[in-house]
């Protein structure tokens, strides 16, 4: 599977400018013959904004329409997170649009309280996966990365996909945790971050792809660019069979509410 990672600056709270910028990037840097999946950062139309009441869109809005159009025109799936409004609630939602018009959504589970995200958005309640070119992919968003139980491999995915607005001040955490998720889950890990600065923070990029050994396949460092990587399903399967750590994993389940 061939993936394009889009690492770029974002214009603060300006969806039109950001969609225009991504339109130009996709036209110049992404080929439909060499790409199965395009990954955009977290909140790619606004930056990591708490202005949900002002900028959140319905699923019938301009951003999802743009994603569907680009996916169908380019012949590749495209995914990233956007602030969304649904039934009176706001969500930091990962959206995946497939060329055949299928749409997959995942609402961020762990909201970043240090930026009061939990005061402006509702948390998601379920982990989601989707299939693409025989790969099973589990999308997660930024702060989710710090919670390994939520990403624990249970035989249901081959790729962990993180989209983020992860600040420069904690870049070592980003790189270390992504690599740990790859090793402990024996999977590919794709992390797509932004560069530049917004109203509050600066971002160093560090979009990266680790294989199931924790070895680096692609590192975009702090460049504004589109990076390309190819993932090998056979190599992953062979490794999991030859070194089956998963057979000794502890069993667990999610418990929503414990009795008093």
Where are these regions (language model features)?
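Extreme N-terminal starter segment of soluble prokaryotic enzymes
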Residues: 1-5
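Cys-nucleophile CN-hydrolase/nitrilase-fold catalytic domain and related Cys-dependent amidase chemistry
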Residues: 15-16, 20, 24-102, 167-187
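C-terminal beta-strand edge segments of enzyme domains
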Residues: 129, 194-260
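CN hydrolase (nitrilase-like) catalytic-core segments centered on the catalytic cysteine
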Residues: 62-78, 146-226
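Short beta->alpha transition motifs characteristic of CBS
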Residues: 46, 52, 95, 106-112, ...
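Structural motif
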Residues: 36-37, 137, 159
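Active-site catalytic loop in hydrolytic enzyme cores
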Residues: 85-155, 169-176, 238-245, 255
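Short polar catalytic/cofactor-binding loops
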Residues: 7-12
């Amino acid at each position: 599977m061939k993936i394009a990672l889009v690492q770029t600056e974002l214009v603060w709270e300006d969806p039109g400018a950001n969609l225009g910028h991504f339109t130009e990037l996709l036209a110049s840097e992404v080929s439909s013959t060499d790409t199965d999946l395009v990954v955009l950062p977290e909140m790619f139309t606004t930056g990591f904004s708490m202005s949900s009441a002002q900028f959140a869109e319905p699923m019938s809005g301009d951003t999802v329409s743009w994603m569907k159009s680009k996916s169908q025109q380019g012949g590749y799936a495209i995914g990233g997170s956007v602030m969304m409004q649904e039934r009176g609630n706001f969500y930091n939602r990962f959206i995946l649009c497939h060329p055949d018009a299928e749409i997959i959504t995942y609402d961020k589970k762990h909201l970043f309280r240090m930026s009061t995200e939990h005061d402006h958005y509702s948390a998601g309640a379920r982990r989601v996966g989707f299939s693409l070119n025989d790969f099973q992919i589990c999308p997660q968003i930024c702060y989710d990365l710090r919670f390994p139980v939520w990403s624990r491999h249970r035989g249901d995915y081959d790729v962990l996909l993180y989209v983020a607005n992860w600040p420069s001040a904690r870049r070592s955490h980003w790189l270390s945790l992504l690599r740990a998720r790859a090793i402990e889950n024996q999977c590919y890990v794709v992390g797509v971050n932004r560069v530049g600065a917004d109203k509050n923070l600066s971002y160093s990029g560090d979009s990266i792809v680790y294989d199931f050994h924790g070895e680096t396949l692609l590192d975009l460092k702090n460049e504004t660019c589109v990076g390309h990587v190819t993932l090998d399903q056979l190599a992953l399967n062979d490794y999991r069979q030859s070194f089956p750590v998963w057979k000794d994993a502890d069993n667990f389940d999610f418990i929503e509410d414990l009795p008093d």
